[in-house]
Amino acid sequence: MQDIGKCARSASRAMARASSEQKNQALLHIAKVVRQKSEEIQQVNQVDVERAKVNGQDAAFIDRLTMTPKTIETMALGLEQIVLLDDPIGKIGTLKKQASGIELGQMRVPLGVIGIIYESRPNVTIDAAALCLKSGNAVILRGGSEAIDSNTLLAQIIQEGLAAAGLPKDAVQVVTITDRAAVGEMITMTQYIDVIVPRGGKSLIARLMAEARVPMIKHLDGICHTYIDADADIAMAIKVCDNAKTQRYAPCNAMETLLVNRDIAPKVLPSLCKVYQDKGVELRVDALTRQTLEQNGFQNLVDATEADWQTEYLAPILSIKTVADIDEAMNHIEHYGSKHTDAIITNNKAQADRFLREVDSASVMVNASTRFADGFEYGLGAEIGISNDKLHARGPVGLDGLTSLKYVVLGHGEIRT
């Protein structure tokens, strides 16, 4: 691991001075070779898949691990989309002339060496490497042992693209050591790695949070809420809350808890919950919500427990609570939320403004689905992940989140007096 770190640190200097043309050339070459080697990628990936089946992995795991022609084409298209993104490196914001005569600005520069730790999705090898490459960083990729053959081949393709553009192949390295001790060492290599970006389940993130010495860009949970205010448009509330929960269940920006103002609950809950039950969503409800729904003929309701309010289901399960007002809703979010994404449905501007100002989450929304908390939807292009921390990056992390700002001073011989 130390040798990998040394090589990455050396390569990061070359990447920092690489031109946009070089970086884009590398990305386009990688996209071309990914398409050319689609069958080989699938064959190698099948080795990983068969091994996972022998090891008893479940169907969802196998699905994440499997690379299909569609998956591979999506990777190639993603590379081409990153080429189209503006290169942030070297850009200087507005220069401000100071009283002394000097001009002061800030230049965007790479972070240096980024470590990506991820689990069973081999497409992350391409996606993460591409974003790090475009932002002028070197990257060390440590994927799950279950995808080692796929990741090794994809790394070879990436390094071929780097060489074709005259960039150091060590700018992208895949850790082929499958021992978990490699992760333990990687997250303490402060002399070589500037930031760790973990992509995986809660147990992985929790372990890294406890053991890492290298700073991380991460989120632990996506416990996202939507609050339907007393002044909400009912049709809008049904449409938005349906989408927030059922458009896809697994993403971290899917709604997990619905909060409903008691004054509008009898008007909106019956219609909305019929939509949910028709789609097979299990409803875990508090006493007031149960009363409202049972009065309208609903059955098969589950009593919500304390654990439900703090659970990221990633499944067709929804917790619902009826609240007295916006204050109770925001207090619930503050107590149980994960500071990821929370939304209010209301036509009351004062209530909307309060929610935006007082809810302490990375993304706060008015009259929109929490599913919009995504790098592509925010116009960032691809994203390396989502952060619910407050320092360095917050929310969806795109190219700018893989950079920092340094001060630049332009003078004309000025001296300090």
UniProtKB/Swiss-Prot annotation:
Compartment(s) where it occurs, according to its Swiss-Prot or TrEMBL record: Cytoplasm
Main location: cytoplasm
NCBIfam families: PRK00197.1, proA
GO molecular function, one term: NADP binding
CDD domains attached to this UniProt entry: ALDH_F18-19_ProA-GPR
InterPro entries: Ald_DH/histidinol_DH, Ald_DH_C, Ald_DH_N, Aldehyde_DH_dom, G-glutamylP_reductase_CS, Glu-5-SA_DH, GPR_dom
EC number(s) given by UniProt: 1.2.1.41
Protein name in the entry: Gamma-glutamyl phosphate reductase
Entry GO CC: cytoplasm
Pfam families documented for this protein: Aldedh
Coiled-coil ranges (or none): none
Catalytic activity: L-glutamate 5-semialdehyde + phosphate + NADP(+) = L-glutamyl 5-phosphate + NADPH + H(+)
Function: Catalyzes the NADPH-dependent reduction of L-glutamate 5-phosphate into L-glutamate 5-semialdehyde and phosphate. The product spontaneously undergoes cyclization to form 1-pyrroline-5-carboxylate.
Organism: Polynucleobacter asymbioticus (strain DSM 18221 / CIP 109841 / QLW-P1DMWA-1)
BP term (GO), one: L-proline biosynthetic process
HAMAP family: ProA
PROSITE patterns, A to Z: PROA (PS01223)
Keywords: Amino-acid biosynthesis, Cytoplasm, NADP, Oxidoreductase, Proline biosynthesis
Family that this chain belongs to: Belongs to the gamma-glutamyl phosphate reductase family.
Biological pathway: Amino-acid biosynthesis; L-proline biosynthesis; L-glutamate 5-semialdehyde from L-glutamate: step 2/2
Gene name of this polypeptide: proA
